[in-house]
């Protein structure tokens, strides 16, 4: 992967302190704490090995769902070079990501469920469980049944998830 940058040359997510780094995408984001969108390049045969899942009635699947699956088997070479210059639109996907996740709840829940089951730092595991429960409230099924997938985190997770869900609903309807 390479860096993405704004047209003014500023790296999205900030500058990095390596020239090259070989690790999987999960370690890159969660253990090394590298932020921001990157310009990932994958071999076609690897992407064919990990197709994007399709969910009935949904038009979006988080790229991270597929990229995390790839990360379980493959490393990426991360290179400190800006090759992709872009701007984020005020009404683009990034600006509307919460609404998109609410509307495409099956894909969102698959992403958070799989991430939770991976070997990730505990703080990230708690955040992931919160987001799983937050978006489970958007699911057109027995929501509490989904909550109890992770009962060990319930006392921490559920109240925060409910607060975030209420905030999401208020923001989406503004």
Indicate residue ranges for each PLM-predicted region.
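Structural register within alpha-helical repeat arrays
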Residues: 125-135
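Conserved nucleotide-sugar donor-binding catalytic segment
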Residues: 4-95
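Preference for long, solvent-exposed alpha-helical segments and helix-linker "stalks"
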Residues: 78, 98-102, 128
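Membrane-interface aromatic/basic loop that binds lipid-linked glycans or pyrophosphate carriers
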Residues: 137-174
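Generic structural signal for hydrophobic core residues of well-folded globular domains
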Residues: 74, 115, 136-140
